[in-house]
């Protein structure tokens, strides 16, 4: 059966048994299959799992659909021990709290909609795990992400995964060229259903484990999590229309996101949506659907894997499930910012989300939406 799952050699100048590979193991099916597959192919596999929260017993260790705590750490260790390769657990709770959880809360307090999974990949999982990889004297860092790394004539490209329903390239736009030198994604050329089959073929105890879905550290809902982290942020304020007319009262801006319709708590003659969040005045601004249609986007903190030319035509994704919109990219006057001009109006562009640009299957790069 392994012949059906051929992968490119991890290194062109080393055979498998000479190649040391650190595998980031979350305790889920994907990273477990990646680790066991490489072990079966003869690579020197070292499993590493980061404990990101829950050591104090007060966090989300038993919630289903999350990763990197409690049962998931046990599952990763069980897979490694059952297969016969070393496995290490590293406590990264303090770093995760600072880089991801506190950033998540602060972004909401600023009236934006964060994506903590991108921040986690950008910092803890890639920046820090790549350093662990170097410290262990390993050649490559492996993850179970559904993306592809293509290399030709010394140029490395990051591309969408073959399985479009599982493609995770949007979440990896902040990956740098330097990081791609050591990163490998062996599952990018597979469909998830076949990865499940491989897990069963390997008789892995987690073969039927459901995919992680939720924000791992949010135990109930995000506003309650933020209230615990920053209770001072939960302050009542006004709900106003686009002309400034007071329509009602809100119980804290962290309970609202741009584009939200439900839960506004006001009656009106037509459907109203959150158009913007005015943190300075602690106001929620609402309006009709056409007030949320937008074509021009300002993007900051850019990371380009291929530097776009002025006016370059691309496809952009403005949220993870967005199928993509045609657009052109132009440099902004401010450093490390750019304007993305969509061909057509788009509904509800949320500050704090990522704007990721593609050229066909290749990830060109992206940044964070300002406005």
Swiss-Prot record:
Site positions per UniProt: Interaction with tRNA: 145, 353
Main location, first listed in the record: cytoplasm
Catalytic activity, EC: 2.8.1.13
Family matches, as Gene3D superfamilies: Adenine nucleotide alpha hydrolases-like domains, HUPs, Translation factors
Annotated binding of ATP, by residue: 24-31, 50, 144
This protein's UniProt keywords: ATP-binding, Cytoplasm, Disulfide bond, Nucleotide-binding, RNA-binding, Transferase, tRNA processing, tRNA-binding
InterPro entries in the cross-refs: MnmA-like, MnmA-like_C, MnmA-like_central, MnmA-like_central_sf, Rossmann-like_a/b/a_fold
Claim: Transmembrane is one of the keywords in the record: no
Disulfide bonds: 120-216
EC category: transferase
Region (Interaction with tRNA): 166-168
SUPFAM superfamilies: Adenine nucleotide alpha hydrolases-like (SSF52402)
PANTHER family: MITOCHONDRIAL TRNA-SPECIFIC 2-THIOURIDYLASE 1, TRNA 5-METHYLAMINOMETHYL-2-THIOURIDYLATE -METHYLTRANSFERASE
Purpose: Catalyzes the 2-thiolation of uridine at the wobble position (U34) of tRNA, leading to the formation of s(2)U34.
Name of the featured protein: tRNA-specific 2-thiouridylase MnmA
């Amino acid at each position: 059966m392994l012949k059906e799952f051929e992968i490119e050699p991890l290194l062109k100048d080393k055979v498998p048994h000479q190649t040391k590979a650190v595998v980031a193991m979350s305790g889920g099916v994907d990273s477990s299959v990646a680790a066991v597959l490489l072990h079966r192919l003869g690579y020197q596999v070292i499993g590493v799992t980061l404990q990101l929260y829950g050591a104090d017993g007060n966090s989300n260790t038993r919630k289903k659909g999350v990763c990197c705590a409690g049962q998931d750490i046990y599952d990763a260790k069980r897979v490694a021990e059952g297969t016969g390769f070393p496995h290490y657990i590293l406590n990264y709770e303090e770093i995760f709290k600072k880089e991801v959880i506190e950033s998540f809360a602060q972004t909401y307090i600023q009236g934006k909609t964060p994506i903590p999974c991108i921040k986690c990949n950008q910092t803890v999982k890639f920046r820090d795990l790549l350093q662990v990889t170097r410290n262990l004297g390993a050649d490559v860092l492996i993850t179970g992400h559904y993306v592809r790394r293509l290399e030709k004539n010394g140029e490395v490209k990051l591309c969408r995964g073959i399985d479009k329903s599982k493609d995770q390239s949007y979440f990896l736009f902040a990956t740098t060229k330097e990081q791609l030198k050591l990163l490998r994604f062996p599952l990018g050329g597979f469909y998830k259903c076949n990865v499940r089959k491989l897990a069963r073929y390997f008789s892995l105890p987690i073969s039927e484990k459901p995919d992680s879905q939720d924000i791992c550290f949010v135990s109930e809902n995000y506003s309650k999590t933020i209230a615990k982290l920053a209770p001072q942020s939960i302050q009542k304020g006004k709900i106003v229309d686009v002309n400034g007319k007071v329509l009602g009262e809100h119980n804290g801006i962290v309970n609202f996101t741009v584009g939200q319709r439900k839960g506004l708590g006001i009656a009106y003659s037509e459907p109203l949506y959150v158009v913007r969040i005015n943190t300075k005045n602690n106001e929620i601004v609402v309006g009709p659907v056409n007030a949320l249609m937008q074509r021009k986007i300002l993007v900051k903190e850019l990371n380009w894997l291929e530097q776009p030319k002025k006016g370059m035509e691309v496809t952009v994704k403005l949220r993870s499930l967005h199928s993509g919109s045609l657009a052109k990219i132009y440099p902004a006057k401010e450093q490390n910012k750019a304007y993305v001009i969509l061909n057509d109006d788009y509904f509800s562009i949320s500050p704090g989300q990522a704007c990721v640009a593609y050229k066909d299957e290749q990830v060109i790069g992206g940044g964070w939406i300002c406005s």
